[in-house]
Amino acid sequence: MTVTIVETRALARAITGGVDTHADVHVAAALDPLGGLLGVQEFPAIPAGYARLLEWLGGFGTVCLVGIEGTGSYGAGLARHIAAAGIRVVEVDRS
C-alpha cells in the first residue's frame, strides 16, 4: 500500500506541457499525468518569454516532456531553450 501512495505522489508531480507556437506569442498548456488541464497561459515568443513559460510549467510540478508545434519554425527557439534545460521535446504536427 505504501508503494502505491509513493508512486501516486510521484506521478502527480509529473507535468507535460504543450505549446501552440506563433510569430509573436506562444500559448502553453500544462497537463497532469492523466491529461487533465492544469492551466493555459500566453507568453511572448522571445527568450525572456521562453524562460517564463518554463518557470510557469515548473510551478505545477516536474516537467517531464513538452510537445511543441513548429520546432523548425516559430517554435525553434523555444524547443532549444527547453532541450537545454534537460527536458524532452517532442514535435507536434500542426494538423
Briefly describe each language-model feature range.
Residues 1-95:
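Phosphate- and other anionic-substrate recognition elements at nucleic-acid/protein interfaces
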